[in-house]
Amino acid sequence: MRIPIKDVTPEIGHARIAGWVHEERDLGGLTFLLVRDRTGILQVTIPKKKVTPEVLAAVKEATRESVIECEGVVKATEKAPGGRELVPDMLRVVSRAETPLPLDVSEKVPAELDTRLDNRYLDLRKPRINAIFQIRNACLRAISEYLWDNGFTQVQTPKIVAAATEGGTELFPLAYFDKEAFLNQSPQLYKQMLMSAGFDRVFEIGAIFRAEEHNTVRHLNEATSIDIEMSFANEEDAMHVLENVVASAYQYVADHCGDALATLGITDFKVPTVPFPRITYKEAIEISTAGGEPLVFGDDLSTAAERIVGEKMGTMYFITEWPTSTRPFYTMPFEDRPEVCRAFDMMHPRMELTSGAQRCHIHSLLVEQIKAKGLNPDAFEFYLNPFRYGMPPHAGWGLGAERLVMTMLDLQNIREAVLFPRDRHRVSP
């Protein structure tokens, strides 16, 4: 049976492995193959006078990135990666790679991001890139486990919808038989409907689609959103869950992803301390203005403003009490100052990671707010009906998985944090 490379030790004595030829060195009487699988790299040493003709023929056939299978004796040696090598008594080429390769998986020859994404199947073989997705997987596992442990039910909501979640024109239309339909921007409306259904606490990890024309290092047109909604809760309750979700993801990565972090060269990985600091929107625009990026009440925070405030805060933090005019129609305003609402953003010093709020659960107020945004309540009848028959107060948020991983690992482009990115210029591969 095949053994993962990370589990191959001299104590095993004899092992069978399979993987890709990462590098090859021919020193005359000796040939060295570095064989890579998902778990690591192992040196396969071929003493030409001591192996069979079949092994020698297979070694000659094997090109870089060919898939091979080999079996042999495992020996300890200080000169090999990981302090061990395998001397094969069987080696065969399972799938020979053509030459030249369109991309150097060993990364000795650098490549532009577009070239890498065009050949993503090869790019993902790189140990450094693979490490990003091992950590992403760990984050989603930790987040799911935290939410399950805290009484949340995982759900899957429709991705084909008849109306915009948040209004606006940032929608991808679909040819849906004889009806008008769109790819969903967010599970927001359905999460809220589940509060009326008595689900109490729900979460979803799924795709969202936004037809934004941004072409930046922090925007995607298809992304993965981690969403929650919880009944009988306000914005403070939602922030409490959020900061603990994020801290638990960091802690899980710190505890279980040491090898992946080392592959990425991260030696000072820090788990954020909870609770995260909180500042109001008013305080944020004052900090931005003092830092040279003037803002007035009602302005959204620009990239420059986020940078100025983030440098001052120096850690993850919340911005609370946003102008009602800047938030979607389903956000609950403060009763005594309706121009301000119970919304928050969770910020990394580099950028926004999450938006959330206490939601409006009062049918008449919700209809008013839909109209105030220039939208037609009739288009939201399916959503509004549950509010007529007993809707508890509720709150929630949506966290971008790619932005979480991007900031956690200090990646320079969000496309690095998704397997096959979709932006305004890329729909393949």
Curated annotation (Swiss-Prot):
A GO cellular-component term linked to this record: cytosol
Binding positions (Mg(2+) 2): E352, S355
Region entry Aspartate, spans: 188-191
Top EC class of this enzyme: ligase
Metal-binding in keyword set: yes
Subcellular location: Cytoplasm
Gene3D superfamilies linked: Bira Bifunctional Protein, Domain 2 (3.30.930.10), Nucleic acid-binding proteins (2.40.50.140)
Biological processes per GO annotation: aspartyl-tRNA aminoacylation
Protein residues bound to L-aspartate: E166, R210, S355, R359
Cofactor binding description: Binds 3 Mg(2+) cations per subunit. The strongest magnesium site (Mg1) is bound to the beta- and gamma-phosphates of ATP and four water molecules complete its coordination sphere.
E.C. number: 6.1.1.23
Catalysed transformations (reactions): tRNA(Asx) + L-aspartate + ATP = L-aspartyl-tRNA(Asx) + AMP + diphosphate
CDD domains associated with the record: AsxRS_core
Record's keyword annotation contains Manganese: no
Primary localization: cytoplasm
Cofactor(s) essential for the protein: Mg(2+)
Domain of life: Archaea
The protein's assembly and partners: Homodimer.
PANTHER family: ASPARTATE--TRNA LIGASE, CYTOPLASMIC, ASPARTYL-TRNA SYNTHETASE
Protein name: Aspartate--tRNA(Asp/Asn) ligase
Organism of origin: Methanocorpusculum labreanum (strain ATCC 43576 / DSM 4855 / Z)
